Amino acid sequence: MSTAQVLLENFDIELPITRRLLERVPANPDYKPHEKSMPLGRLAVHVATLPALGTLILPTPECDAAKAKFPDPNFVSTEKLLADFDACSAETRIALANSSDADLAHLWKFSAGDFVFSNNSRSCTFQHMFFGHLSHHRAQLGVYLRLLNLPVPGLYGPSADEKPAAT
């Protein structure tokens, strides 16, 4: 199995899980559980557009965050959130499917001006910046839903909201 096939297998597991969570995001974009927390709408948009990292990492040798253009972080609606997620996911899936092991072994530099955050293989960078980053923010989003007393979908099995009542 190629590196791209392994990444795609994981991608195809994680994306539907993420979509189920995004489907539950309410139109309450300003909610913050703490003054230092990211507002719900911005967090949801960030999670929805994280798949776009693949179209940045896979075909390019580097990204300078000081010069890069990132998606608009403003929440419009849950429908737009899902449309953006689906579009970003489809583009990245194609980019992954078209990546060879040699492509994924190339170094990819992530910096902000002269400060270098990382300079690892595209495969490592994709796993870290996409899968790891996605899991982190998806967990945050689940906490926001819980604090708003909204049902949280099961991510890797049933959630407390999906378990049948004990008899």
Q: Positions of the model-derived regions?
A:
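Helix-adjacent hinge/juxtasegments
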Residues: 56, 61-101
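Short flexible/disordered coil segments
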Residues: 87-103, 123, 158-167
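Acidic catalytic patch
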Residues: 98-114
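Short, contiguous alpha-helical
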Residues: 8-23, 27-71, 110-167
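Short, charged, low-complexity loops and linkers
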Residues: 1-9
